[in-house]
């Protein structure tokens, strides 16, 4: 029996098993086996040919956004509207066959937008060009999932399932579980909270399935067996996802209202150029970027060339971005903007910068 057949059998077994106290250990074991087989499936085969166009796109700009969706949902049209890149667009499926990068210039930042080929059902098993598409998506800062509004929620659940099966966790945080394999001493299990989904016996069963017999486990929050398996495997990617429903000009106002109220969702129409500005604002929020402007002594601030950093960046991060030796020569900084009580305020390396702050660095 091949890996795909084993995965299919386990999925069927999970689907037909009733979830209750008596079956939780059995389900936990099945989920651990499923995660193991999926990991094996994603390992590149040694006999795989290296022919064909590659998908590797050099990371450029201040952030990377992956555009994922089924064929013919409007990804290429969206890329052409948002950037100066012409991605071939047509009303038939599979127009885009390789990864096409474009750059959005917004609020002084260069955001790399990748138009990935359409994902078909079964992409995680290697159908279509699914594996390469998903591998590129793992390197992004944010996933924009383009969906056809005329098809309701069918596409969304299928795509979520495909990404989930390859270790991409959308709009979730990393489970707060401490896990450390040891050379001896058996399994040490502790928790700082009341656990309602996992027990010590279930944790031991899952660890034994992975041939781990000595480890230290500490649950700092109430997590599910799936979360614990993610911690053991360790190669999961947790990233924000924005669900974008395109073609809203083809559905009723009631349906538009229903889709717009869903969490992490934006409704647009590329054909009529509707709501694209709001989508850009949401994308900026999800990327959590801040623009910092620099100022030389006795001169006006340079508003033409911003330093783009992650939200919560400190003065030290600004120093490293300007020059790697600047932090060691740092004396103090003067900051103008919303992060200070008065302008200018003299601050140290640990001061947290806000969006559109102006900084002047004084060296020793």
From Swiss-Prot:
The modification (3S)-3-hydroxylysine is found at residue 21. It is found in: Nucleus; Cytoplasm. Its EC number is 3.6.5.-. Mg(2+) binds at residues 76, 96. Fairly high levels in liver, heart, kidney, and brain. Very low levels in lung, spleen, testis and skeletal muscle. One of its GO terms (molecular function) is RNA binding. InterPro entries: Beta-grasp_dom_sf (IPR012675), DRG (IPR045001), G_OBG (IPR031167), GTP-bd (IPR006073), GTP-binding_2 (IPR031662), GTP1-OBG_CS (IPR006074), P-loop_NTPase (IPR027417), Small_GTP-bd (IPR005225). Keywords: Cytoplasm, GTP-binding, Hydrolase, Hydroxylation, Magnesium, Metal-binding, Nucleotide-binding, Nucleus, Ubl conjugation. Polyubiquitinated. Its cofactor is Mg(2+). Belongs to the TRAFAC class OBG-HflX-like GTPase superfamily. OBG GTPase family. NCBIfam families: small_GTP. This is Developmentally-regulated GTP-binding protein 2. The lineage of its organism: Eukaryota, Metazoa, Chordata, Craniata, Vertebrata.
């Amino acid at each position: 029996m091949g890996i795909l057949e084993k995965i299919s059998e386990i999925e069927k077994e999970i689907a037909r098993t009733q979830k209750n106290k008596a079956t939780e250990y059995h389900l936990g074991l099945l989920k651990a086996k499923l995660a193991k087989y999926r990991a094996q499936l994603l390992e590149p085969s040694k006999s795989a040919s290296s022919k064909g166009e590659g998908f590797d796109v050099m990371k450029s700009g201040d952030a990377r956004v992956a555009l994922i969706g089924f064929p013919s949902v409007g990804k290429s049209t969206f890329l052409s509207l948002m950037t100066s890149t012409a991605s071939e667009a047509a009303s038939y499926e599979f127009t885009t066959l390789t990864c096409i990068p474009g750059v959005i210039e917004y609020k002084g930042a260069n955001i790399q937008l990748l138009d990935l080929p359409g994902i078909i059902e079964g992409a995680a098993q290697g159908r279509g060009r699914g594996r390469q598409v998903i591998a590129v998506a793992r390197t992004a800062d944010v996933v924009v999932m383009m969906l056809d509004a005329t098809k309701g929620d069918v596409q969304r659940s299928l795509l979520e399932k495909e990404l989930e099966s390859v270790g991409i966790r959308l709009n979730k945080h990393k489970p707060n579980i401490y896990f450390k394999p040891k050379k001896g001493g058996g399994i040490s299990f502790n928790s700082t909270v009341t656990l309602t989904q996992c027990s010590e016996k279930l944790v031991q069963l899952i660890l034994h399935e992975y041939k781990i017999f000595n480890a230290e486990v500490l649950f700092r929050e109430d997590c599910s067996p799936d979360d614990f398996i993610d911690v053991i495997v360790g190669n999961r990617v947790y990233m924000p996802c924005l669900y974008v429903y395109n073609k809203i000009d083809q559905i009723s106002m009631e349906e538009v209202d229903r889709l717009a109220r869903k969490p992490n969702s934006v409704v647009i129409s590329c054909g009529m150029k509707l709501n694209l500005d709001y989508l850009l604002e949401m994308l900026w929020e999800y990327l959590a970027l801040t623009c910092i402007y620099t100022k030389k002594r006795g001169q006006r601030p340079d508003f033409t060339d911003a330093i783009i950093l992650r939200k919560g960046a400190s003065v030290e991060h600004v120093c490293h971005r300007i020059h790697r030796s600047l932090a060691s020569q740092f004396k103090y900084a003067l900051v103008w903007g919303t992060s200070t009580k008065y302008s200018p305020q003299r601050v140290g390396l640990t001061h947290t910068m806000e969006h559109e702050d102006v900084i002047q660095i004084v060296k020793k």
